[in-house]
């Protein structure tokens, strides 16, 4: 009897445990959880799209402030790089020693066009003739150099005006910055060439004095050859 009771109790225990392990399905709760999950996914997708838009806007702003627009060389005239020759001192020396033969290019052309009479042709002494020719060529050479300087500066100013017009046509900050940098570069080049022209003018004045002194020495030499009294000898006599 005791065994029967124990068996019945065990059977009840197993039955109760089996019933306790059966899952209970709540369809409403599952549907609500799924809806919440989908809503979160939609929000995540919207946030990702907003982040993409923000990234694109920041990239556009970055590109507007950086990068190369290729405007550093716009409207640049390479012939204006240096309108005064780098060897202009050598040109002066050549004129002093060669006279007409040293005149070349625009200087020679202008000399031929402007000269109505050659005051040096009748001079037989070679040194005297070359000194005479040098004094004839020198002002022509100065005019050519000064004209080049004026024309080049005028063209640079026209370039600057055109660059300023280009600035008014664009709203690109980087393009404007490049154009402004180019304008500053052109202004610096004008100042640099103006300094060179000033040095050239000083050299020209010094060259005039050298030509005058050379002519004075040649005259003294010719007077001595002819037996004429020298200026210093005359001063000493008085």
Swiss-Prot record:
Keyword Amino-acid biosynthesis attached: no
Region (Disordered): 219-238
A Pfam family per the record: T4SS
Signal peptide, first to last residue: 1-20
Keyword Signal: yes
Record keywords, A-Z: Signal, Virulence
Function statement: The VirB system could be required for the establishment of the replication niche in the host.
Note: Transcription of the operon is maximal in early exponential phase.
Entry protein name: Type IV secretion system protein virB5
């Amino acid at each position: 009897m005791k065994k029967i009771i124990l068996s019945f109790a065990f059977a009840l225990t197993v039955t109760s445990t089996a019933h306790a392990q059966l899952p209970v399905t709540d369809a409403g709760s599952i549907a609500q959880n799924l809806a919440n999950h989908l809503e979160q996914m939609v929000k995540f997708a919207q946030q990702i799209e907003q982040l993409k838009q923000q990234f694109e806007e920041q990239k556009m702003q970055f590109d507007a402030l950086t990068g190369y627009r290729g405007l550093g060389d716009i409207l640049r005239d390479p012939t204006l790089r240096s309108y005064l020759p780098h060897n202009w001192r050598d040109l002066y020396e050549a004129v002093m020693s060669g006279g007409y033969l040293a005149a070349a290019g625009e200087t020679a052309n202008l000399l031929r066009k402007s000269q109505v009479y050659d005051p040096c042709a009748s001079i037989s002494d070679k040194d005297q003739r070359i000194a005479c020719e040098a004094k004839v060529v020198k002002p022509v050479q100065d005019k050519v150099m000064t004209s080049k300087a004026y024309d080049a500066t005028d063209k640079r100013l026209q370039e600057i005006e055109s660059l300023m017009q280009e600035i008014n046509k664009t709203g690109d900050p980087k393009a404007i910055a490049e154009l402004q940098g180019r304008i500053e570069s052109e202004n610096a080049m004008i100042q640099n060439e103006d300094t060179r022209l000033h040095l050239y003018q000083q050299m020209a004045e010094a060259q005039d004095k050298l030509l005058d002194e050379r002519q004075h020495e040649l005259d003294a030499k010719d007077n001595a050859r002819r037996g004429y009294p020298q200026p210093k000898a005359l001063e000493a006599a008085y």
